[in-house]
Amino acid sequence: MPQSTAQLKSPLLHTLLENLTQSSICTSTAIWHVPNPVNFVCNHNENSFDNKNNSVTTITTTDVSTNNHKNTNYDYEQQEQWSNEEINSNQESNEIYTMTFLKLNNAANRVAMNLANYLERKWSSITNKINRTQLNQHSLSIDEPIELRNQSDTVIALFMPPGIDRIVVQIACMKLHLAYMPLDRNVPAGRITQILHKLKPILILIDKDYYDFIYDDDHNDNDKMSDLSSSIDNNNKSLLSRKLSSNDFIIGNLNQLKLTFQLFDVKVYEYIKLMKLSKYYSRSDIYTASIPIRVCLFPFESDPIVLVLFTSGSTSSGPKPVKLRTTQLFNRLEWQWDSTSDMDLPNFENATCNSNTSVKRIGLAKTAWGFVDAFTELFSCLLAGIPVVVPGGSACPSEKSITDVQQLINLTKHFKISHITTVPTQMNLWLKQLRLKPKEIVTSHLSSLRTVIVSGDIVHPKMACEFFQLFKNPEMRLINLYGTTEVAGDVTGLVFRGEIDVKKHTKVVPCGLERENNKSGKPVLSVGTVIQGTAIFIVQDDDDHHLHHEKDNENQPDKWSNPSLSIIGSVDRKPNWDKFPFKILPKGHIGHVCILGQQVSDSASRCQRIESLPEDLNCVDTNKCKSDVESCENNSSKEIRVFMPGDLGFIDPQTNHLYICGRTNELIKINGIRFHANDIDNLFIELKKNWKAKNMTNCTREELLVNKVSETVTLTIQTVHGRDLKLVCFYVLHMNENQNTMNIEPKENYDKLEDLPKQDDFIAVFSHYLPPYLSPTFINIDHIPLMRTSGKVDKEYLRQYYYSKHHCEISEITKVLQPGWVNDPVKHMTENNNSTSDQSFGKNSRDFKLSRGRERARKVLAEVLGIRGPNGDVIPGRPKDDEDFYLLGGDSLLTVLTTEQLRQLGFNVNLDVFTKTGKIGSILTSLQNTESDFLKTQEPFTSDSWTVKEISMNKVLKKSHTCNLINRIPLMEDECYLSPTICPQGSYEIFIEQWNDGNFSVTERHEIVDVLVNAFIEKDRLSHALKLDRTDLTEAIEVFLNAHKSNPGIVLTARYYYENPYEHTFVKNKLVGVIISLPAKHVPSLHLTPKLALVQRFFDECSNKDQFQDISMDNLLATQMVAITSQSPYSKSKYLQYMLSNWKKISLKLLTRLERDLLRIAAKQGYSGVITFNTNEVTEEVCSQLGYKVIQTTMLKSFMNKENLLLLPQYERIRCSYMIKELNPSS
């Protein structure tokens, strides 16, 4: 740790740099910036680092002269000269910019004061902060903050390339206590738009090169840069606008980015940099170590937010903000600087044991700054007085500069770089490339390298050993770190000094985690011990035990003192174990990693707070900053932050080291066996190692073929319905391994080459190690895609690639599937017991036609459910007769699509087929018995009386005996009653009643509102397209319900009732369905809100009165809203978990029953017809089967065009069908 930090009273990061300006290294170089590292060539002598070479252009940035009294504008002119040197550079191949620690601090002071001056002009719109000149009159002991706006909500966005300017702004923001959010042009434009809308920064500071490129088409005369026209030579054009294309600059739609920027305050950084100093500030303030307190935006914020990063994580798709505070970042850096730890870097002038040369500590800052590793990589050096090399510029992102290992060699050789930070995938690529070069070149050119820090993913022990086989220098260290963005980067770490350390800290975990056969396992490498002020637990899998305590653990009041439990590290306060929601596993057991303590960001999406005990814990860590403890006591003295990063791991009982096994979202459980996707990749490595040991002799043909595989990535692939369906292994052959692996679309190898492994070859090999149900699908691609910025394997990209090539796309699920295979011959399905071969009957026989029709119908079901093989074709014989349509992902929408496709094949089918049963065999049998003709026209409903069967269990009717009972629906299929082991005794039924008939009803008004609002918010696409919120929907429903007071219509409710004496429960009931109708002549208009008024205009357009003057509204009933809850009412019953999917079928049956009962009651009350507006495919299909006729269909897109309103593409296919059903009213 830097010696200067010992005198700190608070861990404010910028004070570390300010202390360095008072030390002997203040005039030493802090930054070397190489704008064009791709073409950088190292030509100078290895032993003369400080010698200048003619091929190297070194530009030392000019600082403002301290003699500022000669010319009041001299300060401004010098800053202008500095800016011109950087902006107008032609970026020769070996151009280098440098800046010392003192000049870096002065430049940050200047930018901080200019930025504060600019924000002062608009401060009234940000906060009601008092005048800066009055700030000195206030006591510094004020405890309450002056600002009415929270510091954590005041964020500035920075859109700048790598370089000195970017670092200056970062430090300036720290001095102002102003949180900054980095924007990277390697992030897609759409995601940047999401981020900006979510965080709403007060200012977007953009680099001039970026600005010129984005707005070059809008103003060639550079009108928007008029503020700089007098100070910047307009004849010089930026390198970016000359060398970059739109696709090179940013991913996605550049116009979308322009539209987003128009919503925010956007300023060019050079404008802020070259502003004249405010009259409230003195130029002498620039050259002091710190800026005056009156300049600081939030001077009394003791633990300000420094950095805001966005991460998508592994459990959701949207961007999630993570706000990192000073104490978190300082604690992480202090951990690395600790001189008593192996984490500390070598001394600044550390003479190596086997060399006569001294090695300086020089870092490489190459990580994309949208990742937390970029912060620790850069400021762990700068704030400790260690210089850094920053590659990349406007035309070359920093991470792109080191993709080729030769560029890394050139930079390391020239600058004598001593340590670098990387990710495992990137390091693996480097090792492959370095092995192709002569060892002498690698040894001599990388002789200064001493430390390689690896983080961000799991490091395989084999790769760690290969690293030390290549770098045999005894001073070389490999540091394996573990952490996430939510914990400020890293929380554990371990230093390896050779292969012996790697083998010592490698453990073998059984494949599948629970398999009894331990012969085949995967090796995992330790990630070491935990950072100070933080603890790590290994807790129970909630899928098995619901994370509850067991009785044997409840008897132990202090689990921390139990050495057998999976707990390492320490926190300031003990958790209240009675409130702790997890069961802690014994050491050596694999479970979920759980992180507690001050390193956890309070903005983490999966962070929760638990109660702590008041007494302090006797922590092992004693080297704590006092302000950390005070901050913890002031902010959350009674709570501890707990974070679940989504990783699986265990703690070694002997060493107390943490081992990470994989991700929870890559874990599947089949037949009671948990299996991790990475187990397939590790099994590949172990098998190839065994084959190599026996020199490929006595190997089978399949083993010889599989040995050609170079790399693999195995993932759990989900269906479009969200179920983990299978394991998919993407593999690359040896012939493809040298191809570029950056994130470009992988291509499958369709070449008809001989002796390439096939699916059967893989299965033949893996069947000896894996059960059949765990065998993955193998797909050969030409390379493994990597993420552009982090260098990690782009797993989400592979998943989307699989969906597009081998699976039914999500966007395609709402389209009508065209049966192009209608006339294809039907193949014999040997695995299906119900299929019959063509040889069994004559081709003209009725049985043959029925069998062929059955298999065509099966193919339709497979298409709709997305059941496809690895080649994208429908799997023969699937779905099987004993499978369930709803368990395979079927729902009400898919039943409509299936019905439509079956009708195109000539089947006389309606939704009743899917409401009676979900079994595939039963559905196919019902279809076999249908005739190939059109649906018969249904007769109008009459008011004939209908009877209700006697109900066996009178207890169920305790609360419904006064209701006007219309119908009842049992919640179980007939086959369930035949099996006492499947269906427990009890009563599970739905009763439909008329809510507004004047009789007593147990259904309350608020229940109707809640069911309708929740259903429309969740499933109604029209509400989504028009952006209706809960307030809009609630007001619309209340309007319809209020109309019943003067002009009553018909409101039907469906309630679920349940009683089981074996569960000792009372009668339970819940509202599960509602339909509201009103007399058509008295339907109120919706004009309460602008969005409801838009809905009203749309429906008016659908029922244009000029076109339907012959339809009289006098005796018509109009259906307004209908909804069925999507959540099963019996989902909490411990006996009925197997019936959850059955609710999809029941809900469709209930919807049909509600619509049918409405028609019956309407006919009985004398209505001549019922009209309805259907914007949902399911309700439209139900109404069609009940005899409704379509009067008019209106597309939402055409309506929105008339209104001059934008409509998102995913909603363009929404239509409204205006339908009518004629009735025969009773006399």
UniProtKB/Swiss-Prot annotation:
Sorted UniProt keywords: Ligase, Phosphopantetheine, Phosphoprotein
Phenotype on disruption: RNAi-mediated knockdown in males, severely impairs vitellaria and ovary development in females resulting in a severe reduction in egg production. Also, production of beta-alanyl-tryptamine (BATT) is impaired.
Modified residues (O-(pantetheine 4'-phosphoryl)serine): S892
GO annotation terms (biological process): amino acid adenylylation by nonribosomal peptide synthase; female genitalia development
Annotated segments matching region Condensation: 932-1227
Coiled-coil residue windows: none
GO MF annotation: an example: beta-alanyl amine synthase activity
Pfam family, one: PP-binding
E.C. number: 6.3.2.-
Broadest EC class assigned to this enzyme: ligase
Signal sequence segment: none
Induction remark: Induced in male within 24 hours of pairing and levels rapidly diminish within 12 hours of becoming separated from the female.
Stretches the record annotates as Adenylation: 1-850
Family stated for the protein in its record: Belongs to the NRP synthetase family.
Task performed by this protein: Catalyzes the condensation of beta-alanine with tryptamine to form beta-alanyl-tryptamine (BATT). Beta-alanyl-tryptamine is an essential pheromone produced by the male that stimulates female sexual development during pairing.
Full protein name: Beta-alanyl-bioamine nonribosomal peptide synthetase
Native source species: Schistosoma mansoni (Blood fluke)
Phylogenetic classification of the source organism: Eukaryota, Metazoa, Spiralia, Lophotrochozoa, Platyhelminthes
